[in-house]
């Protein structure tokens, strides 16, 4: 497998042409260009595909109730608006969450999909889990997040993070709408 860099516009175009969860960029491009798609990627499975739902796959261990932090006031609206694209806003909000309570942030490592790792403490861990993860560091936190998810999935992941911080539902909706 070779890696190429594409600009944001091409990335969004390719991502918008996704027809099924887990479809790789190579599969999308092959389909769009009319090339033969690898048989193993498109074969029907005996069992229906399970869609990843962060926070629903694993039951969390019983732990102390997270202390409430008003994250809404921690997010600078002007800086958020200046963030580049959905990925930039996603990273900006995650960094604000980290800065609000760094000692609590390690909880995000528990947020995983069925066969998907969303957070890690190294870029290599995310790339090992998925070659197409496109990991980005969350500010200077030392935590990394997968960014090759669509905006809806980013919102779902962020919702789970905010739940771990004890954020109230109204604030969660308000914050995640900003991605």
Curated annotation (Swiss-Prot):
Per UniProt, subcellular location reads as: Cytoplasm
Query: Which superkingdom, per the lineage?
Result: Bacteria
Which UniProt keywords are present, listed alphabetically?
Cytoplasm, DNA replication inhibitor, DNA-binding
Report the main location listed first in the record: cytoplasm
Q: Name one GO biological process term.
A: negative regulation of DNA-templated DNA replication initiation
Report the SUPFAM superfamilies cross-referenced here.
Replication modulator SeqA, C-terminal DNA-binding domain, Ribbon-helix-helix
Record carries keyword Transmembrane helix: no
| Interaction with DNA: annotated segments | 86-87
Q: Family per UniProt? A: Belongs to the SeqA family.
Q: State how it assembles.
A: Homodimer. Polymerizes to form helical filaments.
- The molecule here is called Negative modulator of initiation of replication
């Amino acid at each position: 497998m070779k890696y190429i860099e594409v600009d944001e516009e091409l990335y969004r175009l390719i991502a918008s042409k996704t027809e099924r969860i887990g479809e790789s960029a190579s599969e999308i491009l092959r389909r769009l260009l009319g090339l033969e798609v690898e048989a193993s990627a498109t074969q029907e499975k005996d069992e229906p595909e399970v869609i990843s739902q962060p926070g629903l796959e694993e039951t969390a261990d019983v732990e102390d109730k997270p202390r409430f932090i008003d994250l809404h006031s921690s997010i600078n609206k002007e800086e958020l608006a200046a963030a580049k694209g959905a990925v930039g806003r996603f990273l900006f909000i995650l960094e604000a969450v980290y800065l609000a309570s760094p000692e609590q942030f390690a909880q995000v490592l528990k947020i995983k999909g069925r066969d998907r790792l969303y957070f890690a403490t190294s870029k290599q861990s995310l790339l090992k889990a998925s070659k197409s993860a496109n990991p980005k560091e969350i500010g200077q936190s030392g935590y990394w997040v997968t960014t090759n998810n669509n905006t809806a999935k980013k919102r779902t992941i962020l919702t789970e993070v905010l739940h771990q911080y004890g954020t109230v539902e109204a604030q969660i909706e308000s914050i995640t709408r900003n991605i």
